[in-house]
Amino acid sequence: MGYASIPSRGSGAPGETDYDGRAVTDLLSTLRDELAQIVDLGVAARVLEWDQLVMMPRGGATTRAEGLATVHRLAHELFVRDEIGELLDRLEPEVADLDPDSDDACLVAVTRRDWDKARRVPPALQGEMTKLGSEAMEAWAEARANDDYASFRPWLDRTLELKQRYIECFPATDDPYDVLLDDFEPGMHTDEVRRVFRRLEPALRELTAAAADDEPEPFLSGPYPRDAQHELSLEVARAFGAADEYFRLDPTVHPFCLSFATRDIRLTTRYAEDDLHGNSLFSTMHEVGHGLYEHGGDAALDRTPLATGCSSALHESQSRLWENVIGRSLPFWRWFYPRFRDAFANALADVPLERFHRAVNRPRPSFIRVDADETTYGLHIILRFQLEQELLFGGLSTADVPEAWNTRMEELVGVRPPNDRVGCLQDVHWSGGMFGYFPTYQLGNVLSAQIWERLVSDLPDAYERVEQGSFGEIYEWLREHLYRHGRKFTPAAMTERLVGGPIDPEPYLRYLADKNASLAAA
């Protein structure tokens, strides 16, 4: 595993900084070699996670949890070694003279941030969190299937206990929730999330209330045969740019995307034969957005910490852009509806395009976040953001979660879940310890509108391209301006480069208002 220590500084060739005869380029190569092994362990863990959620029989949960804990612990121990810190100490003054946007300068800066943070977390705690997350996911899946919150509650209690211990590793943080948010949105503060959500909540509630209270369209309940859903989902995924050579699509309970490398992307989806809103096409377009971000990264960054998306919010901006801004647009359905209607003729043969488009976009309060329309979706996220803070810091007992959830759903969304399966048990995130992730979904929605405005300023015929089923130029624009950079820049810096300013909810609210107005006029 490399070396035992970094030699003291020596004198190199004229004009070249050298450590005991080794050039800076050699030290960078050493750092890359060390990091590559750690990244490889992370990939191995993701393969195990993918298998657990897609292929593994339920009986394998305990041994899988132990195996994942071992892999994560080994990766953590390798990364937090003193030798990595010494390498960074030697390299930082040297790369200071490089272009700050260069791969080498960014690699050192990002590795330093990651290393400093990881050093605060004891390996034993890291292993406990990983093992518990794997076991709790299986407990959640069973509890959800049986509508049995009581059986999941002990797992949630234990998860919250470990999250509190994790937060205590970072005592200097202004707001303890910042620690959790930073895992997914580095550098963002909880106050900034509150600022955005304070602007969004009343506006989203007003937009929801203004929507006509239509009776559900009968064709929403299908039938939508699973095999046809799968074929159409693959067709659109390929059209967007998810080539079979680099992507695969599998069914799962809760759709997700995992990237093992820029050329190995795993997509998952779910199928609902009796609910158009749960049609696999929408979840597939969402996960393809994540996958395209990973696939569009510079392959030169593979096997480094830079080879992934910049942040969860920017990642979600891409899943929501491809799913909603493109995939729920009228131009998209002008292109794809003839094919879709033919595949589901039993449900849609007599349904005109405009009626179909209106049905899949109209605001409609509903129980399930992943099936929510664009307007009410943010209210689902605000609910989770509030409850997470109350669970961790506000005295909300896990015993009271179902009632707190249902009451808040009535207040924010306007519906009360009839059971916990479509209430507090619907999401996998808390079982996996992913506290702090939910806000990034709505931040991603906000960013998707900002990014689309910027894209259209360069490609004013973007929607015309969509209507022709031509997505290549859109993908290439996103790859050039966002995807290829991976994690080289902080989320704030990447957002500034991408849209010319910080995250701003106004373009998103304009987008929703314009869309809802056009739907009302249809």
What do these predicted ranges mean?
Residues T308-L348:
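Post-HExxH zinc-binding segment in Zn-dependent metallohydrolases
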Residues E16-P186, K488, E506, A513-A522:
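A well-structured
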